[in-house]
Every structure is written in structure tokens, then in C-alpha cells.
Amino acid sequence: MGGISIWQLLIIALIVVLLFGTKKLRSLGGDLGGAVKGFKNAMTSEEDKKALEDNAADKPAADAAKVTETAKVAETAPVAETAEKKAESKGKEQA
């Protein structure tokens, strides 16, 4: 009743083809397809850029965790005792 029937759509399509011609419609369709493809490429490149930024942001945190772990190991190692043992072993080698 209030909608557009299939026959009305066909008549509109026929009028558009008569007005613009098939060559112009073909080039318009190609241009529209190229624009959609460019838009999709831009969207995926933005997503890739965000993923790289997220990975770059996570990497310093991982490096900081490694440094903290190394610092904990260094704190627990008896440095003074190790230095004394090295001095004793050098004294034994010289003797």
C-alpha cells in the first residue's frame, strides 16, 4: 500500500539508465567500488596501527617486570660472600 513495489523499482531503474547511460553508470559503479575498497583498507590500517601501539605499550611493562625480577635476584645473592670467595681462590692460585 505505502511501499514501493517491484514494478515501480524497475521503472525507476529504467529511467535512470535512459538518463545516464550504461557507460556512465558502469564508471560510477567502479568509482563507488574503489571508494569502498579504499575505506576498508584505511580501516584495517588504523586497526593495525592501534594493535602495534598496544603491543609497544605492553612491551615496556614486560621489560620492567624482567628488570624487577633481576633486581630481586640480585638483592638475594650474597655479594660480600661471593667477593670473599673470589679473593680466597685468587690467593690459593697464587700460592
UniProtKB/Swiss-Prot annotation:
Low complexity composition-biased segments: 62-81
Question: Which Gene Ontology cellular-component terms appear in the entry?
Answer: TAT protein transport complex
Q: What is the protein's quaternary organization?
A: The Tat system comprises two distinct complexes: a TatABC complex, containing multiple copies of TatA, TatB and TatC subunits, and a separate TatA complex, containing only TatA subunits. Substrates initially bind to the TatABC complex, which probably triggers association of the separate TatA complex to form the active translocon.
Q: Which GO terms describe its biological process?
A: protein transport by the Tat complex
Q: What protein name does the entry list? A: Sec-independent protein translocase protein TatA
Specify one Pfam family: TatA_B_E
Q: Name one GO molecular function term.
A: protein transmembrane transporter activity
Localization per Swiss-Prot or TrEMBL: Cell inner membrane
Q: Which domain of life is it from?
A: Bacteria
Region: Disordered; residue ranges are 50-95
Q: What is the species listed in this Swiss-Prot or TrEMBL entry? A: Shewanella halifaxensis (strain HAW-EB4)
Q: Tell me the protein family, please.
A: Belongs to the TatA/E family.
Instruction: Report the function annotation for this chain.
Output: Part of the twin-arginine translocation (Tat) system that transports large folded proteins containing a characteristic twin-arginine motif in their signal peptide across membranes. TatA could form the protein-conducting channel of the Tat system.
What is the membrane topology noted in the UniProt record heading this document? Single-pass membrane protein
* Spans traversing the lipid bilayer: 1-21
Q: Where is the composition biased (Basic and acidic residues)?
A: 50-61, 82-95
Keywords in UniProt for this one?
Answer: Cell inner membrane, Cell membrane, Membrane, Protein transport, Translocation, Transmembrane, Transmembrane helix, Transport
Q: Which InterPro entries match?
A: TatA/B/E, TatA/E
